Amino acid sequence: MDKFTQDIKDLEVTTVERARQAIANKENATFFIGRKTCPYCRKFATTLASFVAETQAHIFFINSEEPSELEELQAFRSEYGIPTVPGFLHIEN
């Protein structure tokens, strides 16, 4: 298992649709948007893994390289002002 995959193992892999549902349902949720080929995402994932290990926080992961998600993810990122990865979105209602 590569380092990035190891670092995100405690995150819940999810979709843009799930993120939109969380927003619509006014859930408290945190999303990390990234990809393993991004050096900044890999560095952030290492920091995030430590945070999750210490706090047991529940964080969702959206893979920005998932082919089936690309178009919807681009619209989502534009809508919520996430120009690049790594992206981080925390929703608290």
Residue ranges and their predicted role:
Residues L11, P39-Y40, E65-S68:
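Residues that cap or flank secondary-structure elements
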Residues D7, F32, K36, S64, ...:
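Conserved short-loop catalytic and cofactor-binding motifs
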Residues M1-A19:
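N-terminal "domain-start" segment that seeds a small globular fold
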Residues H58-N93:
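Thioredoxin-like thiol-disulfide oxidoreductase module
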Residues V16-H58:
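Local sequence-structure signature of Cys/Sec-based thiol-disulfide redox active-site neighborhoods
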